[in-house]
Amino acid sequence: DRNFDNDNQYSVPYMWGTVGIMYNTDKVDEEDVKNWGLLWNDKYKNKILMKDSIRDSVFIATIYAYREELEELAKTATPEEYRDKISDLTNNITADKLALVEKELRTQYDILYAYEVDSGKDSMINGEAYVNLAWSGDAVWAIEEALANGINLDYYIPEEGSNVWFDNWVIPKYSKNVDIAHEFINFMCDPDIALRNMDETGYTTAVISPDIIDYMTDEEVDANDFTYLFEDNDGNISAENRALIEYYNDEYGIDF
């Protein structure tokens, strides 16, 4: 029941997450890890990545531009009042406000390594950049991948606050394969598939089921269990496929 689809008639939730800052713990001083100001800190000139996304970049720059006002408000406001202020600042854009935000982004531009949408993960994993405006799922994925390179990454939500976003499935009205689109969405919303998708991407599924809740709290789940590829509709594995699984396990060390 969101304002863009009050009766849930046109969209199906897919994934959700947060926007925050991913950083290299060996290169960024802990004292700098607290607010959005890290993205404007010239101590890390040419090592900062910013999202080539108007929604995210303008949102963050707006909060940064009004950081002193928000800092004072946080001392006396209730959580609801503070949230309402953030919402007003970021959703009601005036010409004066936009000019102020543009100034902050132009100032930041001189110290950036790059603007990016997807390549930032690799830049962080390879140690080319130290600071990245990141979506939570990308951060989860990159933190794990970076360990193989001996690089330690972490992720935090700045103290001024951030936003929670949702990705949704929709079917264009001019689609020629509506039935297939529905089947695909149903497939992706199956709890078992949603679990495996979540494990692969690092993002949190919007599908809620007891199985998913149990999975998210079970530390012993094998993330590399691919036996589902060989199961029939009832979850059974034939003798032929079982032999194939054992062959790949023995011959190639693949953990099916």
How should each PLM-predicted stretch be described?
Residues 102-106, 149-170:
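Periplasmic-binding protein-like
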Residues 44-48, 109-110, 127-130, 148-153, ...:
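Loop/turn elements at helix/coil->beta-strand transitions in domains of secreted/extracellular proteins
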Residues 133-151:
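A ligand-binding cleft/hinge motif common to bilobed small-molecule-binding domains
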Residues 123, 227-256:
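Conserved C-terminal helix/tail region of periplasmic/extracytoplasmic solute-binding proteins
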Residues 19, 27-29, 54-58, 137-140, ...:
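Solvent-exposed loop/turn segments at secondary-structure junctions
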Residues 162-163, 167-232:
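Mature extracytoplasmic/periplasmic domains
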Residues 1-125:
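Extracytoplasmic ligand-binding site segments that recognize negatively charged/polar headgroups
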